[in-house]
Swiss-Prot record:
Class of enzymatic activity (EC top level): hydrolase
Protein name: Putative 3-methyladenine DNA glycosylase
Keyword DNA damage annotated: yes
A GO term for molecular function: DNA binding
InterPro entries linked: Formyl_transferase-like_C_sf, MPG, MPG_sf
Organism: Lactobacillus helveticus (strain DPC 4571)
UniProt KW Protease keyword: no
């Protein structure tokens, strides 16, 4: 399946859930680094009060969401960067935020990029993941995935099966809007230690993989 079909032919929350367990790989020009996606959040577009495109808001900063599904949308908050992929057809501004990966490839390089931080602290959050990749800018914003150094492996036999995928509330959502704050649009591998804010007491055997 190609990226255009994968990121357009079903609801964004279904796409987000299906991404869990798939390899996300970044080619930094010297080596390929990355891991299995263990946590991702869906943002449902113009009606989602937590989305950057809520109410049809459109600006150069969030233009990536308005591009065709499979387009990279990188945004910044202070000095931190976040990796999203647009979903649905052009001008239907929905997307998925990749929140965390379990690192597999290029771990030594990722530790160096994270100034020596290792273990679960390496990639257990969206900004940490981007730091681990060595990304400190928006150079790849608005690029289509297949025209970038990023790859999400869509081969089903390369997807790592989880024992359970949890649907839960998204992280850091403003509680002043209880409807959207409580929608279960975050998907993660149950008990995986690389999921953001996963408590050690909840760590699962084999990191939650089947």
């Amino acid at each position: 399946m190609n990226y255009s079909d994968y990121f357009t032919n079903r609801p964004t929350d279904e796409i987000t859930r299906d991404l869990v367990g798939r390899p996300l790989i970044y080619d930094n020009g010297k080596e390929k680094i990355g891991g299995y996606i263990v946590e991702a959040e869906a943002y449902m577009g113009k009606n989602d009060r937590t989305a950057h495109s809520y109410g049809g808001h459109r600006s150069p900063a969030n233009e990536g969401l308005y591009r065709r599904g499979g387009t990279i949308y990188i945004y910044a908050q202070r000095q931190y960067f976040f990796f999203d992929v647009a979903c649905q057809e052009e001008n239907e501004p929905q997307g998925v935020l990749i929140r965390a990966i379990e690192p597999i490839w290029g771990i030594d390089t990722m530790i160096k990029n994270r100034s020596g931080k290792s273990g679960v602290l390496l990639t257990n959050g969206p900004a940490k993941m981007m730091q681990a990749f060595g990304i400190h800018d928006k150079n790849w914003n608005l690029h289509f995935l297949s025209d970038s150094p990023f790859k999400i492996d869509l081969e089903d036999d390369h997807r790592k099966p989880a024992q359970e995928i949890i649907a839960d509330k998204r992280v850091g959502i403003n509680q002043s809007d209880p409807v959207w704050a409580n929608k279960k649009l975050r998907y993660y591998v149950a008990g995986n230690p690389y999921v953001s804010d996963m408590k050690k007491r909840n760590y699962a055997k084999n990191n939650g993989w089947a």
